[in-house]
Amino acid sequence: MTRIHVDGASYEVRSGGDGPPILLIHGFTGRGADWAPFLPALRRVATTITVDLLGHGRSDSPADPARHAVERQAADLAAILRQLGASPAAVVGYSLGARVALRLAVASSGVVARLMLESPSAGIADPAARATRVAADEELARILDRAGIEAFVERWENLPVFASERAMPDLDRGRLHAARMRNRAPGLAASLRGAGQGAMEPLGSRLAGVRSPTLVVAGPLDGVGADRAIAIAAAIPAARQMMLEGTGHAPHREAPDRFADLLVDFVARSAPLPTSERKPT
């Protein structure tokens, strides 16, 4: 474990293995340790780097929501990779982590060798829809402020976006619940306000500038989220898109064996994607 200080904030970073670097970025309410089930296989072919985003795990939780912004954390991660001598790196991100990864690819293209986005969003361009999302995230943040982590997790786990997780084995669901409960309410509240989809600068018009070979992974049970993933893959020139059948918003949790195969294959691909794979069908 390493503490790396960037722009006044301290991040918890872990690395291991041997080979080309791969940065794995967790989702909201998660932490770098979420990727632990996949690390043994990855470390046979790569040097893995996991990080706790701000407000999560053992990284700092700045009180100012603006410090949690996707744009600032993407810049932080670019700096961390450079400090580690791990740039350019393959970058994998899930949900919030996918948004950070996508911003990293847009703003610091030389840092990202390859890009894997699981259940991504490029932000919300429509002002009305964006305002609606900001209001929804503020409601969740107020639950954290007023009622604490237990009430928030109860609400969070019953959101429609996570309905497909109910099919996971009870043991896995129990571990996931326990991990969510270990979060700090102030950190999650600041993250919601500063790094939520509504707070993020929309990237739609800039996706065509992403030159890194990209794999976009989603679950068809994610509904609108799956549609977003398809649209993002279509907008990135060197992208291919894959749906993991029977999964929703979190394919890496709902189908870990299939997702692990995708991850290892992603790391093994060092050449640009063939033309036939560049667009979703």
Which residues make up each language-model segment?
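Conserved acidic catalytic loop of the alpha/beta-hydrolase fold
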Residues: E71-A89
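Conserved HGGG/HGGXW glycine-rich cap/lid loop of the alpha/beta-hydrolase fold
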Residues: A9-P62
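Conserved alpha/beta-hydrolase catalytic His-Asp/Glu region
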Residues: P127-A131, I143-R206
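Catalytic histidine-centered segment of alpha/beta-hydrolase-like enzymes
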Residues: T247-A260
